[in-house]
Swiss-Prot record:
Residues 84-175 bind DNA. GO terms for biological process: anatomical structure morphogenesis; cell differentiation; regulation of transcription by RNA polymerase II. SMART domains: FH. Residues 1-29, 55-80, 280-305, 351-392, 404-429 are annotated as: Disordered. GO terms for molecular function: DNA-binding transcription factor activity, RNA polymerase II-specific; RNA polymerase II cis-regulatory region sequence-specific DNA binding. Residues 1-17 have a biased composition (Polar residues). Disulfide bonds: none annotated. It comes from Drosophila melanogaster. The keyword Transcription regulation applies. Involved in development during embryogenesis. During embryogenesis, expressed in neuroblasts derived from procephalic region, ventral nervous system, thoracic sensory neurons and brain cells. This is Fork head domain-containing protein FD3. It is found in: Nucleus.
Amino acid sequence: MHTSTDPMHTLHDSVSLSPPLIKSSRGGSSIGNGIGCSASSRTAAADAMSMGCDDSDIEPSSMGGSGAAGGNGDGSGSSGGPLVKPPYSYIALITMAILQSPHKKLTLSGICDFIMSRFPYYKDKFPAWQNSIRHNLSLNDCFIKVPREPGNPGKGNFWTLDPLAEDMFDNGSFLRRRKRYKRAPTMQRFSFPAVFGTLSPFWIRKPVPLVPVHFNVPNFNGSREFDVVHNPADVFDSALRADKKFNFFANAEASFYQGSQSGDKFDRLPFMNRGRGADVLDALPHSSGSGGGVGGGSESSRGSKYKSPYAFDVATVASAAGIPGHRDYAERLSAGGGYMDLNVYNDDADTEADAEAEGDDDSCEDKIDVESGNEQEDSHISDSVDSACTNRLDAPPEALIFEASAEASDSSPRRRFDSEPLVLRTSKQSSAKDFRIETLIGHHLHRGGSQEETSD
């Protein structure tokens, strides 16, 4: 019989004097009794036997086996070995899925599909981790929900990454993340856009640079400069200005502030006299340094002007207009008593001016109609009363009691009358006026009665 020391022939030989081979768990060598072979030949024989045996009971090496027994580079082992969890957080996994998508947005199901296709560990554990993905999408500000468009049917909303959160990972490494991203509050988001929609241009607009702008505001005493941080045209939107919602000067009379002369401004004031007051203002001096009327020089006139809201000397106007009692008015101003309302004097002047324009004689409040049996006597009485109203009553009130040609002395009644208070003088003037009218009427009635007796 042919014998050979070749181990391969020994395995296939039906009659063999050599004992059976023993297989080691780690590919050990086979030992044969009675065969003198070297250590190298025994090792080669053991490797050949391992190739011919079933490998189902062979454990994969720690570094990974060959073929199907080896694991992939994502931390997963073979189908029969334990799977290793990837070292990425859920935020990193979601960011990976969104950034690799063509439109940079995915639904929840699309994010889960990407994670399972990339990491077999999560495919084996699905769907236990799906709720964790959903919670991270809702609770982190770096992810934004995008509603579906009307023409894009489907289930669920899209999720995208906030553009300001793209650099939340250090150097693009998903293993290292900076501190948690917080979204800045935006002023455009309101619960009621219909209410705040008209005001949105104010805070959506970019800030206006704080550049000082000077503009003149005309007033009664001249022009004054005001410094503002920016032009009002930069603050208010043009559409709102066109609608005059924020035009605070829309109802103001702009022409009132355009005149440069003080006389033009006061001609448009409602309390100024339209008739006699125009001539009075023309006669007034325009310089504030000139002496006023009775009751003080330039100092008193200047002091009264700043106390009064009107930019003219009231005592000077009263003196030029011939208003009764202007000396007492000037004394009150010089004594620091403040200013008085000129409407008391303007009412009478307006009444007289309107009466002159209409051409009637009803403006004289002292005119009296007296009835008698003789029309001729009535005409005489009417003419006499008219003459008293037009001639005597327009004279200074002192002339009703004293003659105008009489010279006043220190002990005369006229001097004592001038020294009395204004209220007492006014009451005496009214009483004297009524007395003269009653005397005149009684005189005419007495003449009419005597003529009737003579005719009888």
